[in-house]
């Protein structure tokens, strides 16, 4: 309920009490969505002062006790302040302001770990309405399946703030830098993990996580997708080493796993003893990007580099020329883009950034299955 303060102050006291009580009822309903206990917020108002009270109720909605906010836990007080902020954002949005960014500094630190996980889920829902940025030291507020959203912030040896992405080819464990930053030194596997899909690189991981939003690939969400590499490129011999290393999982009957490799790796593993655990994408001359509808992929390249070259229109103009040139090409798409970017002095082509764009487009529009039919065909019968 939006209250005009000037109008409110002109009303008699009994009308003010009714207005505030109705506001408390609405706010208590919102609180119930986020807090695991039945709580009612009340306001007592007199001619001289106004006070808040918090009423706990049982499962039958009968009152248990009434307390003042200052006597509640730190976690509850933090959550109450957070919800008041959300209500303020809602009022701003209803007033026509759609350019809203919610910044949270180390949120939910006073909450129980189970409530922290619930908070993260609610934050995910909220992100559909607002852009949200938050920093955290809590492992429970980090989702390994949304690695594309994470940036690591740290101090270098000269005490300067640095920001970087949490992946690179040199890192043996992609998640390790984040776990270390959060103070957790566990190995990469999640608790109670039963299905693992190993993919070649982080860009493959992002694309497949996006595909998990498609109705035809909904079973993909049951698989934990772990990249063998952190960056754009992993040497073939390193792929072989890592496949050998992780094939030891066959000793654990409760863990089901597959390696999802580009078709250009077929020759190296065709007669291998673990070949039944490898799914190849396409033929010997293809990578995962070659199995995506070409025009759709190139449109995603344009969208990505329009964002990257926002302040350099000349470079973006070159990207547009490259994209139009490649629409008719029949060569491997990534190979062509790498060559063209080098020839035009645009730096290294980042298929990781394009993969992030693809993932987000799939999140926004799950009706894009026809753009990935070749990948779906490769996964049919094993993953889906």
UniProtKB/Swiss-Prot annotation:
- What protein name applies here? Uncharacterized protein MJECL43
Tell me the superkingdom of the source. Answer: Archaea
Name the SUPFAM superfamilies on file: P-loop containing nucleoside triphosphate hydrolases
InterPro entries hit by this protein: Bact_Antivir_Def_Nuclease, P-loop_NTPase
Q: Which UniProt keywords apply?
A: Plasmid
Q: Which PANTHER family match?
A: ATP/GTP PHOSPHATASE, ATP_GTP PHOSPHATASE
Q: Which organism is it from?
A: Methanocaldococcus jannaschii (strain ATCC 43067 / DSM 2661 / JAL-1 / JCM 10045 / NBRC 100440) (Methanococcus jannaschii)
Upper lineage is: Archaea, Methanobacteriati, Methanobacteriota, Methanomada group, Methanococci
């Amino acid at each position: 309920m939006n209250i005009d303060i000037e109008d409110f102050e002109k009303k008699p006291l009994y009308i003010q009490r009714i207005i505030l009580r109705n506001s408390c009822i609405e706010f208590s309903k919102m609180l119930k969505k986020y807090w695991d206990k039945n709580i009612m917020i009340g306001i007592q108002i007199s001619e001289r002062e106004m006070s808040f009270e918090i009423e706990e109720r049982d499962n039958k909605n009968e009152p248990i006790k009434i307390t003042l906010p200052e006597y509640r836990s730190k976690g509850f007080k933090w959550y109450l302040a957070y919800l008041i902020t959300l209500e303020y954002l809602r009022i701003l949005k209803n007033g026509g302001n759609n350019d809203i960014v919610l910044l949270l500094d180390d949120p939910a630190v006073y909450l129980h770990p189970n409530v922290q996980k619930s908070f993260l889920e609610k934050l995910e829902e909220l992100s559909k309405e607002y852009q949200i940025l938050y920093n955290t030291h809590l492992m429970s507020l980090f989702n390994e399946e949304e690695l594309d959203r994470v940036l690591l912030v740290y101090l270098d040896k000269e005490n300067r703030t640095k920001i970087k992405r949490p992946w690179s080819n040199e890192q043996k464990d992609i998640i390790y830098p984040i776990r270390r930053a959060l103070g957790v030194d566990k190995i990469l596997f999640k608790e109670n993990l039963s299905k693992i899909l190993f993919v070649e690189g982080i860009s493959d991981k992002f694309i497949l996580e996006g595909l998990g939003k498609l109705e035809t690939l909904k079973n993909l969400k049951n698989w934990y997708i772990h990249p063998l590499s952190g960056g754009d490129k992993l040497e073939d011999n390193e792929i072989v080493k890592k496949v050998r290393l992780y094939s030891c999982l066959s000793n654990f009957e409760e863990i089901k796993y597959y390696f999802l490799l580009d078709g250009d790796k077929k020759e190296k593993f065709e007669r291998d003893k673990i070949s039944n655990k490898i799914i190849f994408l396409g033929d010997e001359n293809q990578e995962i990007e070659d199995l995506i509808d070409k025009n759709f992929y190139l449109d995603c390249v344009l969208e990505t580099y329009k964002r990257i070259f926002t302040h350099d229109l000349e470079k973006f103009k070159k990207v547009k020329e490259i994209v139009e040139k490649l629409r008719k090409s029949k060569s491997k798409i990534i190979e062509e883009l790498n060559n063209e970017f080098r020839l035009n002095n645009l730096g290294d082509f980042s298929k990781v950034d394009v993969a992030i764009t693809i993932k987000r487009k799939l999140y926004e529009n799950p009706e894009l299955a026809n753009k990935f039919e070749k990948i779906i065909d490769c996964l049919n019968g094993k993953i889906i």
